[in-house]
From Swiss-Prot:
Gene behind the chain: SAUR22
Family: Belongs to the ARG7 family.
Cell membrane among keywords: yes
GO CC terms in record: plasma membrane
Transmembrane segments: none
Chain's role: Functions as a positive effector of cell expansion through modulation of auxin transport.
UniProt induction comment: By auxin.
Keywords: Auxin signaling pathway, Cell membrane, Developmental protein, Growth regulation, Membrane
The keyword Protein biosynthesis is assigned to this record: no
A Pfam family this chain is assigned to: Auxin_inducible
GO biological process: auxin-activated signaling pathway
Localization terms from the record: Cell membrane
Protein name: Auxin-responsive protein SAUR22
């Protein structure tokens, strides 16, 4: 019985740590950027209205559609390109 309780406790800790990583602060969206190795970025929701950011999203839709195994919004471009585009939006 003690083993079951300790396993349940470990499961709760793991689910909390996973939720903490995947949660984005209010007003932000987590995106994964890169071609082979993905890096997580938090972008303001206001970027969704910007044509240059929408172009990146269209590229993502063309490559992955709406069902990507990573589970998050993935943008398949070089990190430098993403930083260049988003730095102009600030």
């Amino acid at each position: 019985m003690a083993l079951v309780r300790s396993l349940l406790g470990a499961k709760k800790i793991l689910s909390r740590s996973t939720a903490a990583v995947s949660a984005a602060p209010k007003g932000f969206l987590a995106v994964y950027v890169g071609e082979s190795q993905k890096k997580r970025y938090l972008v303001p929701l206001s970027y969704l209205n910007q044509p240059s950011f929408q172009a990146l999203l269209s590229k993502s839709e063309d490559e992955f559609g709406f069902d990507h195994p990573m589970g998050g919004l993935t943008i398949p471009c070089h990190e430098d390109t993403f930083i260049n585009v988003t730095s102009r939006l600030q």
